[in-house]
Amino acid sequence: MAGLHSRLTTFLLLLLSALPAIAAAAPSSGCGKGPTLRNGQTVTTNINGKSRRYTVRLPDNYNQNNPYRLIFLWHPLGSSMQKIIQGEDPNRGGVLPYYGLPPLDTSKSAIYVVPDGLNAGWANQNGEDVSFFDNILQTVSDGLCIDTNLVFSTGFSYGGGMSFSLACSRANKVRAVAVISGAQLSGCAGGNDPVAYYAQHGTSDGVLNVAMGRQLRDRFVRNNGCQPANGEVQPGSGGRSTRVEYQGCQQGKDVVWVVHGGDHNPSQRDPGQNDPFAPRNTWEFFSRFN
């Protein structure tokens, strides 16, 4: 009987560990109130004496009583808020509008924020871009209904570096990040707390070498208590993406690494595929957390 009880307990623990990361919703102060921000609105604010801008995208039929997930989308160096909103030709290394995420959000579960960088980037001098994030999060939390446990961040290149910076400094605010071909470009204040972490990088990246992406990944493999992989996986035939799901991570602190044979490209496709895999992988990762 004791053996049966032990096996049953082990089975239940394994079953629970396989379930999606579900936490109680944490409705923001803007829930239950009329919205003070409208769909497509560009907001101007002041951070350390500098004028900053961001645009908000609300789902169709926004419901002030429904706590939405909030997703920050950071542009790469030389790009802009407007180029993330409108998109650029993915066949020439550009990004789909809003990084291709809204069409995958079939349940209309997310609000998107697209910030505009200083000098078209995220140098984050003296933490000013993290302060910008704090300002946006507070304004959106007060003016719209979000689940403050479901705040996410993604970006390509410099935008990936900014998402990594938030994973370091705002682990208590950000549920998960997706770093697309990123590097440590925007600093890493703190950097010792666990955050769910997705990253992808190309082995032929001539702008930010794949080793830079691996370095960022390894920080959160350690922080999240995951078992290190045995060696580095390589892209598949024809440069096809290869995916590693790290094992042994803390509950809800998953780490996923995708490596491909391409260059510095946010819209990399696998051979024979029409659509880039970053949007699908990012949305799948963020959707794990409810």
Swiss-Prot record:
Gene3D superfamilies named in the record: alpha/beta hydrolase
Start and end residues of each stretch annotated as Disordered: 260-280
UniProt superkingdom: Eukaryota
GO biological process: xylan catabolic process
EC numbers, comma separated: 3.1.1.73
Recorded name of the encoding gene: faeD-3.544
Key words of the record: Carbohydrate metabolism, Hydrolase, Polysaccharide degradation, Secreted, Serine esterase, Signal, Xylan degradation
EC class of the enzyme, as a word: hydrolase
Protein name per UniProt: Feruloyl esterase D
Main function: Involved in degradation of plant cell walls. Hydrolyzes the feruloyl-arabinose ester bond in arabinoxylans as well as the feruloyl-galactose and feruloyl-arabinose ester bonds in pectin. Active against methyl esters of ferulate (MFA), sinapate (MSA), caffeate (MCA) and p-coumarate (MpCA).
Protein localization: Secreted
Similarity comment text for this entry: Belongs to the serine esterase family.
Glycoprotein as UniProt keyword: no
SUPFAM superfamilies linked: alpha/beta-Hydrolases
Chief place of localization: secreted
Catalysed transformations (reactions): feruloyl-polysaccharide + H2O = ferulate + polysaccharide
Molecular function (Gene Ontology), one example: feruloyl esterase activity
Keyword Ribonucleoprotein assigned: no
Lineage, uppermost ranks: Eukaryota, Fungi, Dikarya, Ascomycota, Pezizomycotina
Signal peptide (from-to): 1-25
InterPro entries noted in UniProt: AB_hydrolase_fold (IPR029058), FaeB/C/D (IPR043595)
GO cellular component terms, semicolon-separated: extracellular region
